[in-house]
Amino acid sequence: MAKDIKFSEDARRAMLRGVDQLANAVKVTLGPKGRNVVLEKKFGSPLITNDGVTIAKEIELEDPFENMGAKLVSEVASKTNDVAGDGTTTATVLAQAMIQEGLKNVTAGANPVGVRRGIEKAVATAIEELKAISKPIESKESIAQVAAISSGDEEVGKLIAEAMERVGNDGVITIEESKGFATELDVVEGMQFDRGYTSPYMVTDSDKMEAVLEKPYILITDKKINNIQEILSVLEQVVQQGRPMLIIAEDVEGEAQATLVLNKLRGTFNVVAVKAPGFGDRRKAMLEDIAVLTGGQVITEDLGLELKTATVDQLGTANKVVVTKDDTTIVEGAGDSTQISARVNQIRAQMEETTSEFDREKLQERLAKLAGGVAVVKVGAATETELKERKLRIEDALNSTRAAVEEGIVAGGGTALVSIYNKVAALEAEGDVETGINIVLRSLEEPVRQIAHNAGLEGSVIVERLKHEAVGVGFNAANGEWVNMIDAGIVDPTKVTRSALQNASSVAALLLTTEAVVADQPDENGPAAGPDMGMGGMGGMM
């Protein structure tokens, strides 16, 4: 396919037009008085959101050169979202400011490579200063403040703070859509996995259709159990002790299943069988987790163990097990705390090594089941459109809170970026490097300027006053007052602010050093029709 090539000023200007179109659509959402953006969906109702990265991902421009500029800024938002989970609008605003200022200077004759060095030098200093003024997050109230600022809703803040208090920093908090109007929190304590009983005849409570086992023995194996003879020996030992039993196996079927159900109905013993969770290697790892949590062993040929020779000593135990049609929950497993800690550290090490987002998520779930618990925030709303918008805001709030726990908090509302202005301005440089530093200085003011603008105020006036205020004092755009931002609970996670600045400067510096842009020429004849495929002239239909 033929290509279009643009050089130097033409190339950069075309990309800037794309940057501006995307950034202008995103930045109207910034701050407490930011507006929403409506996104068309080909199927279903439109999506109304103020989430920067969601908006950025939806934007495709017709002009290929402009589209490349838009995609670069979309990358800033996506990368910030991947690292910190929030701050995507701030990152977009910073990137636009740096690119606009940078292109002015490059057009005026500045050397882009020198400008880039200046940007990198200024951002490195800015990040050091952000870390220096960062405060650790210690109380439930602080967590609630971070979540409330991100979601724009105090109730959501309290809900997320309670969830984190209940499941700990290692716990998993998931967000689901509720069928009702209210948003509520559901916490599962203990280890839960998504496998239920293999037969409904195993229930102990026919009203709730669940099996509750008090102080059961737990047999854990990766084998299929077809014949009752395979587990007869260990079953007899458990019956002698007069305690119930949970069997976790690849499957329990045929004669083994029938015998277990028959004896359960006769009242000979209380036993429940469930399938092992997960698949393949992940299944083995999860069975090992259950074994560590309950103080048992996985009966597997990999370790040279057989079901026929299994003893009570190899079984795990727990205070209580609840099994429903869909889930099994093990409460207060009797495993050794030292072994559980070692297993937790092993999973943490695997999380640091993996490059797959999916694997990391699954490892995080396993970690939560061992170390904390699982909390589910069920999001309710009157309409589907409101539900989607609310769910996105709560996801942002949760990510913000996690980032705050990790690296601490700084004054919110863009105040922290202006408060480090003087430290960055004190950097000594000359020529184009100094120009690069000045570009970053101008961009540090931009989030405050945009928040004020979205609140219907003159941003430059607010910025000038902010530079002369005491450290930590900022402008609360929600009510127009000047307050101590941290005392007022207007805070941003340090990680979010840092990531936004780093990613914005990275893309801005690359765009400024661009000298040629290559794009596909549009096909004037439109897309070619597909082959006929013997369908009588319907080849072009898709």
Swiss-Prot record:
Its EC number is 5.6.1.7. It is an enzyme of class 5 (isomerase). Keywords: ATP-binding, Chaperone, Cytoplasm, Isomerase, Nucleotide-binding. Residues 533-542 have a biased composition (Gly residues). Residues 521-542 are annotated as: Disordered. InterPro entries: Chaperonin_Cpn60_CS, Cpn60/GroEL, Cpn60/GroEL/TCP-1, GroEL-like_apical_dom_sf, GROEL-like_equatorial_sf, TCP-1-like_intermed_sf. It catalyses: ATP + H2O + a folded polypeptide = ADP + phosphate + an unfolded polypeptide. ATP binds at T29, L30, G31, P32, D86, G87, T88, T89, T90, G413, N476, A477, A478, D492. Belongs to the chaperonin (HSP60) family. Forms a cylinder of 14 subunits composed of two heptameric rings stacked back-to-back. Interacts with the co-chaperonin GroES. This is Chaperonin GroEL. It comes from Listeria innocua serovar 6a (strain ATCC BAA-680 / CLIP 11262). The gene is groEL.
